[in-house]
């Protein structure tokens, strides 16, 4: 039996509900949907594409104890949303390629589901990451396309090493 770390989503209602990965995750009991940003668990790891520190395997303990929170908002509104709320334990995901139908092939334009899969994989909750792919038919493709990078990131010692791996990959 897979013990999934708690996954929280602050949903800003800025998307098409029929295509929303967050709403489907909540419907499948894979994540807890929060309608109020002030209900975000204060010690959870916050996925923030603008955070200065990259997610790394050294964050596993935070994920295990307090879970992961994603803010589901439009990419057009994202920067403003993250500036508006101040959270502890903010981490950015390293370079990965989106495989969702809306942003397929675009670097770093991940859906909330892809962000959770990446965060779980990098913090060495790999079985749990694979389990999340059951939410959408295309989700398994995300791990397959990014497999080499996800493996390298998950073997890094710390955030600095994750950034080095990312820079090395982007130089090639």
UniProtKB/Swiss-Prot annotation:
Protein localization: Cytoplasm
UniProt-listed GO biological process terms: enzyme-directed rRNA pseudouridine synthesis
Record HAMAP family: TSR3
The protein's name in its UniProt record: 16S rRNA aminocarboxypropyltransferase
GO molecular function terms noted in the UniProt entry: 18S rRNA aminocarboxypropyltransferase activity; S-adenosyl-L-methionine binding
A Pfam family hit: Fer4_RLI
Main location: cytoplasm
Phylogenetic classification of the source organism: Archaea, Methanobacteriati, Methanobacteriota, Methanomada group, Methanococci
GO CC terms in record: cytoplasm
Domain of life (superkingdom): Archaea
Leading EC class: transferase
Cross-referenced InterPro entries: RNaseL-inhib-like_metal-bd_dom, Tsr3-like, Tsr3_C
Function: Aminocarboxypropyltransferase that catalyzes the aminocarboxypropyl transfer on pseudouridine at position 914 in 16S rRNA. It constitutes the last step in biosynthesis of the hypermodified N1-methyl-N3-(3-amino-3-carboxypropyl) pseudouridine (m1acp3-Psi).
